[in-house]
A protein has these predicted regions:
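Short, solvent-exposed coil/turn segments at beta-strand boundaries
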Residues: 62-64, 169
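Surface-exposed ligand/attachment interfaces on beta-rich extracellular proteins
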Residues: 51-54
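Short, flexible, solvent-exposed loop/turn segments with mixed acidic/basic and small polar residues
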Residues: 56-60, 102
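Contiguous, amphipathic alpha-helical segments that mediate oligomerization or scaffolding
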Residues: 74-78
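An acidic- and aromatic-residue-enriched active-site/binding cleft used to recognize and process polar
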Residues: 72-73, 218
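Short, well-ordered loop/turn sites that connect or cap secondary structure elements
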Residues: 61-62, 207
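Active-site environment of non-heme Fe oxygenases that use a 2-His-1-carboxylate facial triad
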Residues: 4-19, 26, 30-37, 41-43, ...
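Short, hydrophobic/proline-enriched secondary-structure or compact coil segments at domain edges
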Residues: 65-71
């Protein structure tokens, strides 16, 4: 992937130092103050999520879809553990592309996922991709043998270069997920979703300690979906063959 110089971004007196990156979203390596003030260790909570930078930062996430903040020196009490694990036989719900908060009356505006400083590295990836590109990619990558009568018109539409109407995308994705869950074993399903990641242009970079990923979750123009992604086949198909660092999560527009 070719590295490109990103356009400058300013949040009040603070200027994010952006990584050279041409993939999905923006990657912030550090913050710099135009007046030369030192940057707080936890620049996410002490600068970006505080007024007057808070709303411009949330708007930046809405616009970019994904903003990655590197080298954040501390966590915050509002973070909570990301729970859920997968098994040898079936995928857990977290391995399917999803928005957060779908079961509630209103989805959160932004989802933050944090890899805290810890003794054990995080080996399992998190894939983040635009919606409804995830739905179109799932249709394209669906094996022909799994195209049911319900999915056939949507599959044909996708292969012909058409787009599923946004109002129908949740329905179609639900049909796809049920088909995958019913007809593919766990490792075949993981291989399928790896292909979906690539087609949808997912962000799947390795986690680093002190990294936060801010994901637009409710923006009608630039919303994202995410999933837990096993990028390597584990011995005997088992995903838990090595120690794996944990992740934290919160909904910063509502909780921070």
């Amino acid at each position: 992937m070719t590295n490109l110089a990103p356009a400058p971004v300013e949040l009040g007196p603070w200027r994010p130092r952006l990584a050279a990156w041409s993939g999905l979203g923006l990657v912030i390596e550090a913050l710099e103050h135009t007046g030369g003030l030192p940057t707080p260790t936890n620049y996410v909570d002490d600068v970006l999520l505080r007024e007057p930078q808070r709303e411009p930062f949330l708007a930046l996430i809405d616009h970019a879809g994904l903003v990655v903040c590197k080298q954040v020196g501390a966590d915050h009490p509002t973070h909570r553990e990301v729970r859920g694990r997968s098994s040898r036989g079936r995928l857990s719900q977290g391995e399917y592309y999803h928005h957060d908060g779908c079961s509630g009356p209103v989805k959160p505006r932004v989802v933050e996922i944090r890899c805290p400083h810890q003794a054990t590295p995080r080996h399992i990836a998190t894939a983040i991709a635009p919606f409804p590109a995830t739905v179109h990619a799932m249709l394209h990558e669906l094996p022909l043998a799994l195209v049911t009568a319900e999915l056939a018109p949507w599959h044909a539409l996708a292969l012909a270069g058409g787009e599923v109407p946004l109002a129908d995308c949740d329905l179609v994705q639900g049909l796809l997920n049920r088909t995958i869950r019913r007809d593919l074993d766990a490792e075949s399903a993981r291989a399928y979703f790896r292909a979906v990641d690539l087609r949808a242009g997912a962000y799947r970079e390795p986690w680093s300690f002190g990294e936060s990923r801010f994901i637009a979750n409710r923006n009608p123009v630039r919303t994202m979906q995410h999933r837990r992604a096993y990028l390597e086949i584990r011995p005997n198909g088992h995903p838990n063959g090595q120690q794996n660092g944990h992740l934290l999560k919160r909904w910063p527009a509502e909780e921070a």
